[in-house]
């Protein structure tokens, strides 16, 4: 089963989300408005990073909802 990794760095004000192995990261492409796409060597997106991320309520927990494809 695939895992999603969510990393929030409150000091660096970044939110990074990987839906594939972070070790596959080879290329980062800034696409605008503080969004960076993280790609593997083949150019497939394995995650993204949001710069200047400040949650509206930092004391709130981050809720992650996974939608699994139906078979």
Regions found by a protein language model. Name each.
Residues 1-71:
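Small, basic N-terminal interaction modules of short regulatory proteins
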């Amino acid at each position: 089963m695939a895992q999603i990794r969510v990393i929030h760095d409150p000091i660096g004000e970044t939110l990074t989300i990987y839906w594939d192995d972070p070790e596959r990261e080879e290329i980062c492409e800034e696409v605008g408005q503080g969004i960076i796409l993280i790609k593997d060597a083949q150019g497939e997106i394995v995650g993204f990073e949001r710069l200047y991320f400040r949650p509206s309520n930092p004391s709130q927990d981050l809720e992650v909802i996974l939608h699994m494809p139906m078979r």
